[in-house]
A protein has these predicted regions:
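Short, compositionally biased pre-sequence/patch detector
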Residues: 1-183
């Protein structure tokens, strides 16, 4: 899973790498560093992504295997990754505008406050743990909605007022009630 926040450095929540070689030949720390350096050299920000926007991508696929000692990504790899990101951005589902299909490959929020409002709404409805795009955010959060809201709102305190303003009054009251019970 890949998260891009406006112009900030992308965050990769989960990365799978297939290594072709023997276990004895594999140096896991060196492989990790090489993959990190290779991916860090690619600008994954899709053109037109507004500053502050949050794009969460379910999967990003590379091309054919790279040579084990690659020091730079070949230009066709870079072009392929950028084209995927462009498509994922332009076809992203918008949770703030309505339900997201279970097979959605990416979701887009206009900013962190919109993302927090949608996450709050899904926690209140008991749906957050079922949504693939919340998994990296909820990884270290308590399962109960009240303590989860307390942890999430505390970590994103500057976004809470705008997030609450976009909720329905009954949703905001319910969220405050759960939040208060968890303190």
């Amino acid at each position: 899973m890949l998260t891009i926040r406006g112009q900030a450095q992308p965050t990769i929540g989960h990365l799978s790498v297939r290594y072709r070689g023997t276990a004895a030949e594999m140096n896991a720390p060196a492989l990790r560093l090489r993959v990190q350096r290779l991916l860090g050299s690619v600008d994954l920000h899709p053109a037109g992504l507004p500053t502050g926007a949050v794009l969460i991508v379910r999967r990003l696929h590379g091309l054919a295997p790279l040579p084990a000692q690659s020091q730079i990504l070949p230009s066709d790899w870079t072009a392929h990754l950028r084209a995927q990101m462009r498509t994922l951005y332009t076809t992203a589902a918008r949770p703030a505008l309505g339900p997201v299909a279970t097979n959605a490959t990416s979701v887009l929020f206009t900013d962190g406050a919109e993302m927090l409002a949608c996450l709050t709404r899904d926690l209140l409805a008991g749906l957050a743990w079922q949504r693939w795009y919340w998994q990296h955010i909820l990884r270290d959060v308590p399962k109960a909605p009240g303590p989860a809201l307390a942890a999430l709102w505390s970590a994103r305190a500057t976004q809470v007022p705008a997030a609450l303003a976009s909720l329905e009054k009954t949703e905001a009251r319910h969220a405050f009630a759960l939040f208060s019970l968890s303190l």
